[in-house]
Amino acid sequence: MKHAFSIRTLLAALIAALLSFPVYADKVYDTDIVVVGGGGTGLAAGVQAKMLGAEVIILEKQAIAGGSANYAEGIFAAESTMQKRQGIDVSRKFAFHAIMNYSHWRANAPLVSAIVLKSAETLEWLQQFGVNYEFIGVGAFGGPLTWHVVGELEINGKRYNHGSAVMAALNQKFRDLGGTILLQTPGKKLIKKDNRIVGVEGVNKDGEKVIVNAKAVIIGTGGYGNNKEMLKKYARFPDVIMVGQAGKDGEGIQMAWEAGAGEEGAEIMIPYRPGLPDFSTTSHLIAAAVQPYLYVDPNGRRYTDEHNISEWPFSGNALERIGGVAYSIYDEQTRQLFLNDGIQMALGEWVIYGTKLDKLDEEFNKELAKNNGNVFKCNTIDEVAQKIGADPKVLKETIANNNKAAAIHKDEQFFKNADFLRPVEKGPFYVTKLQPRALGTFGGIRINEKTEVVTAQGKTIPGLYAGGLDAGGMYGDSYGLEMGGASFAFALNAGRIAAENAVKYIK
């Protein structure tokens, strides 16, 4: 017995010794702050931390930095210098209450306040790196003027516009300040010691294990829009078409959860205009289909005020409610309108108001030839009904009501703006399937107003920060478009706030 006990003791000692050895890595780096993700949150955090004197390494999964922020168009701000010069009255008080009321006060009020209060300062902070703003627009039709659309910028002989201009400017500034970006090196796991986060494990493009030892970690990996398992588990509508989500696999969220982070907002998405898979934001086929004229469900009935397409969350929620499939129907007269006069409703800066859809026929006929059920060209309403699986009587009644509304300039069912009432009268009739699309997920990691990651009970996890699409709390159950540019602003401002607090923490 005595011998057996000594063997067990020896084995226990050996195991303890092995566990105390440093984790093996092919490459090891030491820094003050490591940022996981080189998008809007990550680059803003990296530049801000460097400007405050910290040494910073950014781990970026893709071959280029910027992430989906490269495709943003404008940035939210309240009480900006540009707004004041133009006599635009959008106070911080108004913006804060608008965001909170939209969420029915389910959003994290201290966090929302912190973002709103910093928003104007961040616009001017970016200007010192060459970023400029073309104009101030609205997010949703009739909304407040908060969307500061970014203008063109030239860096090293290459021209950038909109979000890519901001990302290029931050990328250049970060490198000028001596920051290090490890491209094609995703973070995989947080390193925790004595209940503090002290680094990140990652893997580079050669499959080598990389360890970055740091005093603080900032997470901003862009959500989980490319992770089908997470979509199935958390998204309200997991079959949504995700737009521009390459590499967004949720690693940042998962590593934070594994380290004890609370969960918040994992189910929230950034709904986009309905459309079809594999069509770009500049598609003329989609631009025609989403004009707010006549949408029907698979039974042939109107289900919404079509003009709510101008506020994506509304159109996404309405489409989700009926099962995720609808059909846009317009006639030959409306097709001619698209070709000769242009569209009535812009698709952001991608297809602007009045654009003549000269690529519509080419795109439509190409999709029609695939015979995949996405588009139909029909000579009669009976044929339209047959193609979408609706009762012809029901569809004919819907169209008759639509045509009556167009004739009297009054929608007596959903009270749509009369400017968008158009008849469907003379064939051929053009039908396009509409399915839910999203520009990403928006939540997962619970944070406080300092962007410190917290547990489900609200206790901070020392040394860990998060922002952008990985972080929850900015919205309630639906992303809001009324404050134009809010998601880009959240990424940039959260990154700066995280950097400021991380630098204070490590000192």
Specify the residue positions occupied by each region the protein language model found.
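An anion/pyrophosphate-binding glycine-rich loop and adjacent beta-alpha core
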Residues: I253-M255, G262-K387
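Glycine-rich loop(s) and the adjacent beta-strand/alpha-helix scaffold that form part
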Residues: K205-T282, E482, F488-I497
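Conserved redox-cofactor binding core of oxidoreductases
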Residues: A114-E208, K228-E229, I399, A405-K426
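Beta1/beta-strand and adjacent pyrophosphate-binding region of the FAD-binding site
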Residues: K27-T41, I57
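Glycine-rich FAD pyrophosphate-binding loop
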Residues: M51-Y71
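Bacterial N-terminal signal peptides
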Residues: T9-S20
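Glycine-rich active-site loop/strand segments that organize a redox cofactor
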Residues: A77-A114
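A glycine-rich dinucleotide-binding beta-alpha-beta segment and adjacent secondary-structure elements
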Residues: K189, V394-S478, E482
